[in-house]
Each structure stands twice: as structure tokens, then as C-alpha cells.
Design a protein with these regions (language model features):
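PLP-dependent amino-acid enzyme catalytic core
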Residues: 1-170
Length: 170
């Protein structure tokens, strides 16, 4: 079960790779509430996804790290896993659908991952990643349905609560 303690642990681990981002008012959104935006787009990979990937890989055993990791993505998670794996000295293979933006594919390769382009859509890339995981013994880094990934991504909420303790909703 995910605990607040684990999210705090992730926050400490992530100081190595994810900077604390600003919260800015969304002045162009007109509604009855005050809306703020967290500028996760300025993270090294352009999104918050590096947080979950980095913490997940940091929690792997040495044996799991030796075997490498695999993930599927349409872009942002791919870059997060690629960078996180490279920083940990872990081999990574990312399955992306052929239609993924070329900029995402190039960035993923640039962060050190091997890329497997899969004919079809995201679901096809997901299935291919699961097949390769079984075939080669990689650890699968799920983009959202994983306790360690959620803990890493949950550090965004800690930062929001630190900067805006009276926030009504996140």
C-alpha cells in the first residue's frame, strides 16, 4: 500500500534529478476559482514523468538493475524512463507506437534508451513491452499503475502543499 512515508522518501531521492518547480497563477483561465499551474514542463525531460520513473528505478534490486528495464509510452514516460535508467547505469528499452512524435523518439534515444517502434497504437506498444519483458527478464516500468511510480509522481503534491498549504484541490 502506498504511504505518505514512501512519498517523502521519493522526495529525498528525487533531489538528485527533479528540481522543485514554480506554481504560477493561470491568469488566462477565467472561472469562479483561482487556478494555478505547476511548471513541470521545465523538468529536464519536459514533464513530471521523470519523477516516477527515477524513483521506481532507484528502488530496484541490483539483480533487477542488471537485467534492465522496459517501458511503453507515447512520449513523456519514455523520456523519463530513459533518463532515469541512464542515470542509474541501467539498460533501458522503450516500446513506442510508430506514430509517436519524432521529437519524443529522438529525445528518448538521446537519453540513452534503445527504442522499439511498434506498428499500431499505444496498446500495441504496451503488449509488445510485456512480451519482451517475459522474453528477456526486464523489469517493466508501468507509466502509472505502480506504487513506486505513483510515489515519485506524488512528490508534485508535496511541493504544492508546501507552497500553498491552504489549497482546496489538486
Amino acid at each position: 500500500m502506498l504511504t505518505l512515508e514512501k512519498i517523502y522518501k521519493a522526495s529525498e531521492v528525487l533531489k538528485e534529478v527533479a528540481g522543485k518547480t514554480d506554481i504560477l497563477p493561470a491568469s488566462k483561465i477565467f472561472c469562479d476559482n483561482h487556478i494555478f499551474l505547476k511548471t513541470e514542463n521545465i523538468q529536464s525531460t519536459g514533464s513530471f514523468k521523470v519523477r516516477g520513473a527515477y524513483f521506481k528505478i532507484s528502488e530496484l534490486t541490483e539483480e533487477e538493475k542488471k537485467r534492465g528495464v522496459i517501458a511503453c509510452s507515447a512520449g513523456n514516460h519514455a523520456q523519463g524512463v530513459a533518463l532515469a535508467a541512464t542515470k542509474h547505469g541501467v539498460k533501458s528499452l522503450i516500446c513506442l507506437p510508430e506514430g509517436a512524435p519524432i521529437s519524443k523518439i529522438q529525445a528518448t534515444k538521446g537519453y540513452g534508451a534503445d527504442v522499439c517502434l511498434v506498428k499500431g497504437v499505444y496498446d500495441d506498444a504496451y503488449q509488445k513491452a510485456l512480451e519482451l519483458k517475459e522474453q528477456y527478464g526486464y523489469t517493466f516500468v508501468h507509466p502509472f499503475d505502480d506504487e513506486d511510480v505513483i510515489a515519485g509522481q506524488g512528490t508534485v503534491a508535496l511541493e504544492i502543499l508546501e507552497d500553498m498549504p491552504k489549497v482546496d484541490a489538486i
